Amino acid sequence: MVNFGAQSIRQTLVQLLGFAAIFTSSYMFYKGLSIVANSESPLVVVLSGSMEPAYQRGDVLLLWNRQKHVDVGEVVVYNIDGRTTPIVHRVLRSHASDNKQLLLTKGDNNAVDDVSFYGGRNQYLDREKEVVGVVKGYLPLVGYITILLAENQYFKYGLLGITGLLAFIQGE
């Protein structure tokens, strides 16, 4: 028979507080990293093979956005209005125009530059408005789990089931 006494409730509350502490600590670390790196997304997972062989699918990129100028050859992550997924590509050309830097990018594994990604509105990216950050480091394949969760429903539901089963078993 299951005992739902005061001890069981106390144990459940302690577990919930532990989960809340882990979640809030992780969130605070991420937000602190965002402030230090001056980037809304200081960690980005590579989702496509457009930057191979430099970066593989599943690599986690560490971004820095405190420099005013980006050099040709550096890898940047940028967002375009209307697109939900940031793009990771190398700077091919750089131009100064009206006190702002304009960039032309291209994936290492792509045949052509990214002008078609820019939506036909212009031929270059505005460094100040569209670049999320410059890649300063990476962790190989660490983010592959996010790709598996997004692309494989069996993996996602299997992981949720195992997590629920472990929580149930540990609760007894």
UniProtKB/Swiss-Prot annotation:
Enzyme class label: hydrolase
Domain of life (superkingdom): Eukaryota
UniProt cross-references to SUPFAM superfamilies, sorted A to Z: LexA/Signal peptidase (SSF51306)
Segments on the Lumenal face: 37-172
Spans through the membrane: 16-36
Keyword field: Endoplasmic reticulum, Hydrolase, Membrane, Protease, Signal-anchor, Transmembrane, Transmembrane helix
Reactions the enzyme catalyzes: Cleavage of hydrophobic, N-terminal signal or leader sequences from secreted and periplasmic proteins
Enzyme active site: 50 (charge relay system), 89 (charge relay system), 114 (charge relay system)
Compartments where found: Endoplasmic reticulum membrane
GO cellular component: signal peptidase complex
Pfam family name, one: Peptidase_S24
Region (C-terminal short (CTS) helix): 158-169
Stretches of the chain found on the membrane's Cytoplasmic side: 1-15
GO terms under biological process: protein targeting to ER; signal peptide processing
Record keyword Transmembrane helix present: yes
EC number: 3.4.21.89
A molecular-function term among this protein's GO annotations: serine-type endopeptidase activity
Main location class: endoplasmic reticulum
Quaternary structure, from the entry: Component of the signal peptidase complex (SPC) composed of a catalytic subunit SEC11 and three accessory subunits SPC1, SPC2 and SPC3. The complex induces a local thinning of the ER membrane which is used to measure the length of the signal peptide (SP) h-region of protein substrates. This ensures the selectivity of the complex towards h-regions shorter than 18-20 amino acids. SPC associates with the translocon complex.
Job of this protein: Catalytic component of the signal peptidase complex (SPC) which catalyzes the cleavage of N-terminal signal sequences from nascent proteins as they are translocated into the lumen of the endoplasmic reticulum. Specifically cleaves N-terminal signal peptides that contain a hydrophobic alpha-helix (h-region) shorter than 18-20 amino acids.
Name listed for the protein in its UniProt record: Signal peptidase complex catalytic subunit SEC11
Originating species: Yarrowia lipolytica (strain CLIB 122 / E 150)
Gene: SEC11
